[in-house]
C-alpha cells in the first residue's frame, strides 16, 4: 500500500536497514518505480504476470529516462521514477503505446523542475507528490489527454520531450535554459 511505501521510504532515509529494490542506483527511485504499480495492480485485481510486465515497463522507462540525464542531475529522481510508474499504471489500465506517451508528456508537463536538494527524510514527500502525479498522468493518458506541445518544454514527439527534460536536468533550471528550450522547440501543427 501507499502508506507502507511511505513508511519504508522514511525508514530508509533515516538510516534504517530496510531492503528495497534499486533503480538507477537509488532505492527511492526503485520504490517509486515499483510500489505504485504493484499497489495499482492489486487495487485493480490484475493477475501477477500482467503486474510483473507493468513493473518491468515502469523500471525500464525510468532507466531509459535516467540514462539521458547522465551521472549527476539537479532534478529530483522521483520525477523520473514517477514517470516510469505512470507508464506502468497506464499499461495496467489497458493503455498502449499512444496512451503511455501521453502519460509521459503529462508527467514532464507536471513535475519537471522539482529540484534535488540532497537525500533526506523529506524525499518521501517529493515521492508522494510524484506518485500522485503518476496516477493523474495515467488516468489522463488512458483517455488520450495530455499536455500539449504548445506548453512549456513538452514537444509533439515524446523523445524530444525527454531530450528537453534531460537538458533541463543537466544544464540547470535557470530561466534562461527554460526560455531557450521553449523558444527553440520544433513547432507543432496548429491546434484547431
Predicted region positions:
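Feature representing long, continuous alpha-helical segments
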Residues: 63, 83-87, 132
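Phosphate/pyrophosphate-binding betaalpha-module
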Residues: 46-60, 64-82, 96-101, 113
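Glycine/charged-rich beta-loop-alpha catalytic/anionic-binding loops adjacent to active sites
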Residues: 12-22, 62-72, 115-120
Amino acid at each position: 500500500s501507499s502508506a507502507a511505501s511511505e513508511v519504508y521510504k522514511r525508514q530508509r532515509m533515516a538510516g534504517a536497514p530496510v531492503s528495497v529494490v534499486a533503480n538507477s542506483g537509488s532505492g527511492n527511485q526503485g520504490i517509486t518505480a515499483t510500489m505504485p504499480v504493484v499497489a495499482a495492480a492489486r487495487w485493480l485485481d490484475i493477475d501477477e504476470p500482467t503486474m510483473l510486465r507493468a513493473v518491468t515497463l515502469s523500471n525500464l522507462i525510468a532507466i531509459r529516462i535516467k540514462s539521458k540525464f547522465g551521472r549527476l542531475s539537479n532534478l529530483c529522481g522521483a520525477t523520473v521514477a514517477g514517470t516510469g510508474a505512470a507508464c506502468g499504471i497506464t499499461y495496467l489500465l489497458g493503455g498502449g503505446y499512444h496512451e503511455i506517451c501521453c502519460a509521459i508528456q503529462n508527467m514532464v508537463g507536471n513535475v519537471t523542475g522539482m529540484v534535488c536538494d540532497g537525500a533526506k527524510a523529506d524525499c518521501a514527500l517529493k515521492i508522494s507528490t510524484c506518485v500522485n502525479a503518476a496516477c493523474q498522468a495515467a488516468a489522463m493518458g488512458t483517455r488520450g489527454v495530455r499536455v500539449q506541445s504548445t506548453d512549456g518544454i513538452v514537444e509533439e514527439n515524446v523523445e524530444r520531450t525527454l531530450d528537453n527534460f534531460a537538458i533541463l536536468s543537466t544544464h540547470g533550471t535557470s530561466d534562461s535554459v527554460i526560455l531557450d528550450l521553449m523558444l527553440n522547440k520544433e513547432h507543432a501543427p496548429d491546434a484547431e
